[in-house]
Amino acid sequence: MDAIKKKMQAMKVDRENAQDLAEQMEQKLKDTETAKAKLEEEFNELQKKLTATENNYDTVNEQLQEANTKLENSEKQITQLESDVGGLQRRLTLLEEDYERSEEKLNSTTEKLEEASKAADESERNRKVLEGRSNSYEERIDELEKQLETAKNVATDADHKFDEAARKLAITEVDLERAETRLEAADAKVLELEEELTVVGANIKTLQVQNDQASQREDSYEETIRDLTKSLKDAENRATEAERQVVKLQKEVDRLEDELLAEKERYKAISDDLDQTFAEIAGY
């Protein structure tokens, strides 16, 4: 009878120990599942950050390419404007030279006109005095009159050319003003592009990458890409490590579940043994 009591006592202790162990295993399983859920959440967060980093990388790359394209277009426009201004300046110089030549020609024509007028007056006096002389003298008068008419026509043409030169000069001044306006607009566009590049740099800083000089030089852009690539690789490494941790924890959970199942079976066996012992005692 004492042996049975001792056996019952030992079985009771084993059952209590098994129950305590089962509770501990259940708690450990819960803790492990909590850690697993946390790691899975961190893994998902890393996946989101990885996706965001890739998207940010593509966005930054596109923004930098677009900024470089705009800057190149602005430089081409400025070069074209400078070429246009140079052409207008050359045209203005030619017009000024043409104007000077026209003015000289006008002065010369005016002098000739005065001389022709004087000659005509002199011829008129001579004609009155020498009237009746040979027809050759009259022809000379006609010739002088023709020369006078020619001189007047030359003076008129010179006036027209002077007016035309003045008109071209005015047009050139208007074109020059327009070119200056276009140049100012190009300068404003360059400033606008520089502001856009500054905004791009600020956006890149908010993405926690070192790309604050991406708008200035290509080597800074390449350095930023290297930083983004490194961050991407770090994120991939962290994601890989998280996957390994999840697999490891899953194995630990499976092992604990197996141990818990074994302890439950052991507990059931002890309970069955106790029930059988109680039944035997009751039979006595």
Curated annotation (Swiss-Prot):
Keyword Lyase: no
Domain of life from the UniProt record: Eukaryota
Assigned keywords, A-Z: Allergen, Coiled coil, Muscle protein, Repeat
Stored Pfam families: Tropomyosin
Gene3D superfamilies, per database record: 1.20.5.170, 1.20.5.340
Biased composition (Basic and acidic residues): 102-131
Coiled-coil ranges from the UniProt annotation: 1-273
Region: Disordered, residue numbers: 1-27, 99-131
Molecular function terms, GO-annotated: protein homodimerization activity
InterPro entries (UniProt xref): Tropomyosin
Subunit structure: Homodimer.
Domain writeup: The molecule is in a coiled coil structure that is formed by 2 polypeptide chains. The sequence exhibits a prominent seven-residues periodicity.
Assigned protein family: Belongs to the tropomyosin family.
Protein name: Tropomyosin
